[in-house]
Amino acid sequence: MKSTRKSAGKMTKVVFRRYPDGQVIALFPDIPWSGRRGEITSYMHLGQHGAADYHHVLATARLATEDEYGDLLFELQSIGYDDLHVVQRARPKFINT
């Protein structure tokens, strides 16, 4: 599947974390959600795209295993994210920390 997104040709970093209640979140550390400091784009099965505070999620959710994030990765690929690069942690490019 060829990507039609503006970032086509670039790898999109994604960090998968698992909350204590079992929900898995995909964080896109290089895709800002708004101009607010620390707010990045995220994706979950329920709610789908939304804002997330990157540092808060890292502090409250643990790294997800491949088995835990597999379904969410498949869902992301099915909606056009064909260029994902799974990383454990990343420093958002647009946040001065």
Residue ranges and their predicted role:
Residues 12-21:
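A short beta-strand micro-motif
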Residues 2-13:
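Negatively charged, low-complexity tracts enriched in Asp/Glu with abundant Ser/Thr
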Residues 54-97:
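Mixed-charge, Lys/Arg-enriched low-complexity segments
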Residues 29-70:
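Acidic, low-complexity, intrinsically disordered interaction modules
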Residues 21-31:
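Short, solvent-exposed loop/hinge segments that bridge or flank secondary-structure elements
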Residues 1-2, 61:
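Generic detector of short, aliphatic-rich beta-strand segments that form the cores of beta-sheets
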